[in-house]
């Protein structure tokens, strides 16, 4: 049934106005305050929250009481007078909303904060794209991928909707492809929802708002740098407007052969932000550091000429900031791997550098002998490093000295292997083989022939002879053939045979492993005597210490060379010595039981330094303090152990070693190396040695506990290790003595104000160059290029002092002024160093001095010469004098002529004038010339005088005659 129309200022309209105002719709508020009759402006609409806003919001929204709602006819009239909120009103259908209470102010403010609109540049770029016009709710695609929170958005416009009682329909979403919709221009889709509460309510006011959940796409930004030095500052590249989801990639690429060094100047990131520094090697990205490891001052170097900085943030309240300084540095190839049984010599690791490889005697190089460092985004060697391998057979011509070694690789797939070596000495010489090591498997065989074929005389056959001929083998001629046969899949045999050629009529050169010898004749002729000695820790066995070359017809040594083997126990009384495991450097045998007793001076004690210790877990090494095996044990070791240092309290020390007889089952270790030296027995530490290229100072005369020794290096050397050592309570030093290493780098010369610099190597090694360039408006004073070079004495230094960049005006030369009777070409007030100034003289003057002077750089700058002088030209001066003299002569003649002519002319003019005057005016003239004396007829009156014509005439004539 129809209801009464409410008043314009009814409570329901006030509530609607309040809700619209709180939700931020000025249009709705304006519509509510439209006029006295409550008429709505055609362009206005109500904005009220719908039931689909939030569950909490739904509970706080109720429709007005039926008694306060407009009538059916009034609502239909209002509906016809209002424009639709959307162009296609028919596509949006509404149902009556549930009757809920209006939300409180706190709830609305909370809802507004949660539904804050967030726009992204990606969305803005899609304006006008129908495909992107509508953004729907969607499930997250990948939980592992970081996604931005999906904010709810409120559409900027809503409409007051009515629903007739005979047409209730469920809420529907508008068609995405609806033509002409404003959504096609980039706005978000509007949806509405309502539900019918009761059939008794015929008409109700629908509270509608649109809620859109948008999953934002990130705002992408990419910046590339190619300068050799610069800064990456996040504040220089702010995010696009309305964007809180940002992904930025900063790429720095420098010249090929150079890398990029990043130094962290500052980093201030918010929680959840990601900052990653990556090395770029083609398509491969390698993380060098991330935000968890970045601290101020940290330096990261790229392995190639490109480095990438990736920054990602989800923050909408404020973005993190960071600043990185980058500069180019010269890349180098990695140090090439040294081949086993070989050596490598590297000339330079930078581009163009060369590495040379060679193998020890008996090994052959597999691969290139020389590698070159190739200039690339990541410098690399021209090929793989070669390897040194012992060949299976081979031929040696013109042999002198060499080795035959057991092959490095197994044979065929079935395990069989046949190796043949042919050794030929120069004509007239013979060969001697010394079998330093010969360990053959029971199924392996070695045969040695005195000749090039297997039909030659037999010298040795391992199947026929059980003992090894350690004295060696001599050829009958100039060649030897060695055959080695193995049936093992993995080569178990090991041998090392040394050969040498020698002249007939002489003895061969003797050889002793782990020892040395002296000879009376280096040519080993008849009668030569050789004396052998062993290295420390070894003793002579199986031969005399002295042998002699005998037999003139066929010279040979009167006895075999002895062997030097590591002793299994013994008594040592030297002030210093070495204790080695039995059979060192070969592995010790199983079942060994050795005891060494060391005795030094009575007032001394023993310092034992265990340098290497590698035993099996079933073998035991025990060290006792004293000359008896007593319970006072200094140390007991088994297995592998780090280096140890021990002191005895007496001048005696006992070392006991026991190897397990079942070593073949449980395995054996490699052995041990120990050095000992006698030290002072009093309460002081042993004296420490001097160091090369340095010196030491001692805090006390006696090296008692607490005494310190300080080491220092000569100029040009850096100390490596602790420079100060302290005598500890156990009379041992706190650390090993240091050593001095030659300094191969320069100290940083520093920055130059108003300039930039380019460093070839940030480590500043010898050869590093620094190029300084002044900023515009400044001039470099000094050398622009500094090079670090090494000196024989002293530390490396730079080739010149640090330059300075001074302003052009402060270095300019002032204009020196104009020379008298001269002028300048291209006049200026200031002249920069290097500029020149040219002077010229006026005609008739000659320039004395430099025509052109140059501004010389200095403090202050000055001209290269003084101001020139313009003097009168001598020839011009003489011509001027002659002209002046001629002018004066002509002037004097003219003056004399004028002096004569002018008076004559004046007299003539006077006479002529007088004559003209007299002749023309004598009849009526009353003028008489005055006379110097009184006239005899002065008593005659004037009238009488001039009235007598005869008298006048006579007097006139008489006057003329008198004149």
UniProtKB/Swiss-Prot annotation:
Glycans are attached at residues 251, 268, 290, 375, 398, 414, 454, 516, 558, 614, 682. Residues 28-63, 116-150, 164-204 are annotated as: Disordered. One of its GO terms (biological process) is adult locomotory behavior. Residues 221-329, 392-502, 568-679 form the CUB domain. Residues 120-135 have a biased composition (Polar residues). Expressed exclusively in the brain, predominantly in neurons. Wide expression in the gray matter of the brain with high levels in the olfactory bulb, anterior olfactory nuclei, hippocampal formation and cerebellar cortex. Detected diffusely and weakly in the white matter, such as the corpus callosum and cerebellar medulla. In the cerebellar cortex, intensely expressed in Purkinje cells and granule cells. Detected also in interneurons in the molecular layer. Disulfide bonds join 221-248, 333-373, 359-388, 392-419, 507-549, 534-564, 568-594, 685-727, 713-740, 746-788, 774-805, 813-855, 841-870. Residues 47-59, 191-204 have a biased composition (Low complexity). Keywords: Cell membrane, Disulfide bond, Endoplasmic reticulum, Glycoprotein, Membrane, Repeat, Signal, Sushi, Transmembrane, Transmembrane helix. Its main location: membrane. It comes from the Eukaryota. Residues 1-31 form the signal peptide. Residues 32-897 are extracellular. The chain crosses the membrane at residues 898-918. Disruption phenotype: Mice lacking Sez6, Sez6l1, Sez6l2 exhibit motor discordination, and PCs are ofen innervated by multiple climbing fibers with different neuronal origins in the cerebellum. InterPro entries: CUB_dom, SEZ6_CSMD_C4BPB_Regulators, Sperma_CUB_dom_sf, Sushi/SCR/CCP_sf, Sushi_SCR_CCP_dom. Residues 331-390, 505-566, 683-742, 744-807, 811-872 form the Sushi domain. Pfam families: CUB, Sushi. Residues 919-963 are cytoplasmic. It is a single-pass type I membrane protein. Belongs to the SEZ6 family. Candidate tumor suppressor gene. May contribute to specialized endoplasmic reticulum functions in neurons. This is Seizure 6-like protein. It comes from Mus musculus.
């Amino acid at each position: 049934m129809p209801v009464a129309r409410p008043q314009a200022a009814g409570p329901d309209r006030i509530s609607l106005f309040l809700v619209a105002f709180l939700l931020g719709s000025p249009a709705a508020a304006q519509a509510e305050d439209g006029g006295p009759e409550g008429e709505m402006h055609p362009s206005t609409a109500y904005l009220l929250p719908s039931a689909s806003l939030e569950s909490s919001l739904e509970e706080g929204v109720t429709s007005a009481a039926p008694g306060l709602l407009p009538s059916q006819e009034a609502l239909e009239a209002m509906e016809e007078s209002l424009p639709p909120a959307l162009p296609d009103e028919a596509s949006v259908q509404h149902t009556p909303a549930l009757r809920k209470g209006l939300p409180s102010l706190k709830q609305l403010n909370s809802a507004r904060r949660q539904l804050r609109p967030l726009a992204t540049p990606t969305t803005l770029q899609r304006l006008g794209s129908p495909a992107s016009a509508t953004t729907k709710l969607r499930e997250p695609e990948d939980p592992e991928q970081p996604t931005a929170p999906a904010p709810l958005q409120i559409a900027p416009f809503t409409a007051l909707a009515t629903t007739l009682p005979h047409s209730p329909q469920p809420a529907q979403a508008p068609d995405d492809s609806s033509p002409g919709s404003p959504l096609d221009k980039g706005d978000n889709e509007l949806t509405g929802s309502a539900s019918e509460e009761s059939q008794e309510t015929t008409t109700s006011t629908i509270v509608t708002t649109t809620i859109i959940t948008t999953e934002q796409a990130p705002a992408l930004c990419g910046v590339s740098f190619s300068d050799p030095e610069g800064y990456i500052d996040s504040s220089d590249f702010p995010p696009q407007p309305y964007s809180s989801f940002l992904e930025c990639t900063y790429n720095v690429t420098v010249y090929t052969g150079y890398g990029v060094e990043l130094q962290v100047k500052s980093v201030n990131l918010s929680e959840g932000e990601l900052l990653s520094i990556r090395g770029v090697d083609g398509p491969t990205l390698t993380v060098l550091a991330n935000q968890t490891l970045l601290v101020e001052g940290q330096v990261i170097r790229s392995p190639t000429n490109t480095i990438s900085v990736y920054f990602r943030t989800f923050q909408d309240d404020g973005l993190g900031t960071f600043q990185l300084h980058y500069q180019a540095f010269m890349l180098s190839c990695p140090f090439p791997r040294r081949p086993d049984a070989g050596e490598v010599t590297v000339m330079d690791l930078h581009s163009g550098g060369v590495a040379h490889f060679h193998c020890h005697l008996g090994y052959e190089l597999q691969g290139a002998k020389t590698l070159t460092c190739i200039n690339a985004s990541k410098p690399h060697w021209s090929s793989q490093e070669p390897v040194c391998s012992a060949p299976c057979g081979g031929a040696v011509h013109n042999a002198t000295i060499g080795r035959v070694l057991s092959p490095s690789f197994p044979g065929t797939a079935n395990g069989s292997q046949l190796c043949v070596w042919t050794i030929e000495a120069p004509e007239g010489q013979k060969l001697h083989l010394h079998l330093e090591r010969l360990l053959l498997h029971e199924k392996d065989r070695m045969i040695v022939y005195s000749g090039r074929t297997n039909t030659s005389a037999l010298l040795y056959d391992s199947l026929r002879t059980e003992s090894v001929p350690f004295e060696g083998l001599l050829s009958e001629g100039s060649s030897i053939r060695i055959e080695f046969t193995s049936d093992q899949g993995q080569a178990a045999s090991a041998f090392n045979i040394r050969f040498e050629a020698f002249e007939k009529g002489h003895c061969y050169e003797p050889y002793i492993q782990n020892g040395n010898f002296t000879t009376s004749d280096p040519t080993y002729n008849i009668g030569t005597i050789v004396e052998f000695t062993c290295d420390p820790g070894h003793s002579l066995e199986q031969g005399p210490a002295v042998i002699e070359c005998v037999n003139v017809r066929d010279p040979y040594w009167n006895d075999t060379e002895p062997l030097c083997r590591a002793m299994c126990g013994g008594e040592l009384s030297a002030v210093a010595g070495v204790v080695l495991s039995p059979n060192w450097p070969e592995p010790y045998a199983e079942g060994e039981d050795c005891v060494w007793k060391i005795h030094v001076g009575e007032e001394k004690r023993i310092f034992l330094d265990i340098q290497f210790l590698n035993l099996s877990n079933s073998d035991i090494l025990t060290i006792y303090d004293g000359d008896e095996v007593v319970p006072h044990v200094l140390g007991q070791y088994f297995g592998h152990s780090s280096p140890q240092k021990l002191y005895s309290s007496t001048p005696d020390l006992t070392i006991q070693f026991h190897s397990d007889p079942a070593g073949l089952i449980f395995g054996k270790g490699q052995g041990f190396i120990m050095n000992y030296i006698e030290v002072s027995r009093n309460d002081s530490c042993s004296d420490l040695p001097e160091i090369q290229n340095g010196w030491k100072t001692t805090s006390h005369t006696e090296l008692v506990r607490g005494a310190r020794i300080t080491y220092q290096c000569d100029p040009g050397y850096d100390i490596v290790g602790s420079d100060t050592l302290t005598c500890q309570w156990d009379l041992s030093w706190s650390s090993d003595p240091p050593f001095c290493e030659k300094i191969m780098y320069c100290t940083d010369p520093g920055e130059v104000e108003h300039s930039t610099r380019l460093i070839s190597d940030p480590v500043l090694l010898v050869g590093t160059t620094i190029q300084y360039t002044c900023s515009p408006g400044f001039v470099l004073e000094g050398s622009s290029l500094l090079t670090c070079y090494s000196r024989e004495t002293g530390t490396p230094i730079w080739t010149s002092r640090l330059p300075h960049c001074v302003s052009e005006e402060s270095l300019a030369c002032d204009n020196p002024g104009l020379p008298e009777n001269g002028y300048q070409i291209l006049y200026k007030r200031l002249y920069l160093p290097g500029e020149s100034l040219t002077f010229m003289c006026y005609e008739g003057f000659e320039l004395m001095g430099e025509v052109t002077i140059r501004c010389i750089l200095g403090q202050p700058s000055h001209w290269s010469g003084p101001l020139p002088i313009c003097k009168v030209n001598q020839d011009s001066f003489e011509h001027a004098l002659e002209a002046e003299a001629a002018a004066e002569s002509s002037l004097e003649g003219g003056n004399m002529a004028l002096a004569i002519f002018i008076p004559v002319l004046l007299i003539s003019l006077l006479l002529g004038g007088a004559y003209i005057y007299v002749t023309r005016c004598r009849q009526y003239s009353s003028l008489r010339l005055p006379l110097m004396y009184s006239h005899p007829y002065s008593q005659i009156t004037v009238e009488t005088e001039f009235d007598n014509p005869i008298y006048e005439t006579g007097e006139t004539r008489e006057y003329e005659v008198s004149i």
